[in-house]
């Protein structure tokens, strides 16, 4: 009995002697992206309290809802962000797992401060530039918002052809910055050095641009492009009859929308532009990315069947309230019948269902799923260059390039060029698999071969 008491006493003293107060630093690695996280722990009268910092996101002092430490086990919970960290203190390190939104990632914490990793991006230009660069603002009078961007000219004085760069889906700045890359900065630099002026701008509601991104659809973004054209026509440095559009991903859907209605557009370039209807594209994208991530055929088939039914509801719906009811019932039924389905940590089933319904029924998603690019492409009469990467899993080249070419040809457009670049992904990087998880790990931002081909084609159209 005495030895048992001594053992319990040893455990108690050992636990008491472990000091977890102070700063704990870690790096969260998600799909090649590295995000520094810091937990600041202080002792209270009864237990512990802490805050969380995310230096790379500019966030500091985020309240940690619950901090527990018992027998070397530590747990942090941030309820609002649905974050949970569980770890075990081993000497001067906490070995543990970071959870958020149903996903888990290994992340260890230490006392040592972690400096931001300098990622190599050799293609990004550095100032001073060899050309003229000007920050500009222009108005979208239809939406009553101002948009801010950058206009680059080969020289300050002169008269040049110009392209407007149109970003892909999701809120993005003028450089189309994502996963540590700035594709539009690289494209702009290359084209401007090749005698072509470039206008790139922050999406509405992003950076210095005004407006509400969340409520906008592709049709709304098309009016932003139209206002960019109107602005460029006021600039003496721009050749009014040589204004082109270069759209990436969703931008490759928007460019034809504008070109089909505007005589001011003299050519368009579609970088991984969509050629098939949105609901079909999302299902194809989901299947290819799941395969690349090693998901089983059985799980892929099950997921595709579920989403096909949900997407069909969206495409057929013309009543938003009824749609939300249908979606809610359908997702609840799926969760009831599928015991393997997981609700994200810190989230109730109702909260999870509501999140899914709001995402699928958002204005942007409904518009995208219902929109068939072919109907617009058939009306485009200006020269078109459509290019894709062979390993693009988000906008697969075979289905989309074929659909784009067929629609343009059907409409009588005789100046159509399509090309599939070997070993390039959705961002036009030279890659191994094409999986989105690779994007940030690749030093290259945009294939020099693709840049050269695009620039040469534009030069031919603007001679």
Question: Where are the language model's segments positioned?
Answer:
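Accessory cap/linker subdomain of secreted extracellular hydrolases
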Residues: 271-378
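Central antiparallel beta-sheet cores of small beta-barrel/beta-sandwich binding domains
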Residues: 18-90, 95-103, 130-131, 184
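Alpha/beta-hydrolase active-site loop
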Residues: 215-236
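Short beta-strand/loop motif that positions the catalytic acidic residue
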Residues: 380, 386-388
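N-terminal cap/lid segment of alpha/beta-hydrolase-fold proteins
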Residues: 114-158
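Short amphipathic alpha-helix adjacent to the substrate-entry channel of hydrolases
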Residues: 177-198
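Short beta-strand element of the alpha/beta-hydrolase
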Residues: 159-169
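Alpha/beta-hydrolase fold nucleophile elbow
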Residues: 237-249
